[in-house]
Amino acid sequence: MFKVQILVNGTNCDILEHEVIKMPGQKMPTYPAIELKRFTGLEPLIAPDGCAVGKLTDFWSWAYSDLMGNAERGALAEYIVACALGIETKKRVSWDKYDLMTENGIAVEVKTSGYLQTWEQKALSKPIFGIQPTFGWDSKTNEYEAEKKRQSDIYVFCVHAHTDQETADPLQICQWEFYLMPTKLIDEQFGNQKTVTLASLVRAGAEKCEYSDLKNRIYAVMQK
């Protein structure tokens, strides 16, 4: 029996169970987890005739340049927090139960929002974050946990706070704001709530933190 988690617009919606039928005498194939390789970006894209048609950096530029979009902006925020924690050399694991793991074993969930979007807006967006409990997935075993809960020890809420379209640049960390809240406090304040606004987080005690202090403050908050 294996489970598949379905997501719609980044929201965990349901868990579907599927049974693998093993026929008598049939040997089930085993495919161990693939060890992730960190690419440099210089790797060539090879055509059937053996000629290079581009480099991996060309693909990255083509696919992931929308840093104002919610998907790429979210991945960028994870990398920014990883840099602050000094763990940026570790490879990102998509769909893992938490986003980052500090050197001393603190599981970190990074959530991202912003006031500006890539599409035409009638008004600035209101920062809102997904905080729904989930069934944790283990990337090594491909199994889901039985208990639905928030998987990390602490949340880092990242807000791209810039509001001028002409100068907006998510690569400028000075345009970001960071707020910390331990998962225990989120559970106490918001229960099984799926989303939360920035204003609600601040009222509930989220700590605003400078980028340069993220690592020390995360460690300090978790020691309380």
Model-derived regions, located:
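Nucleic-acid endonuclease domains
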Residues: M1-I106, K111-K224
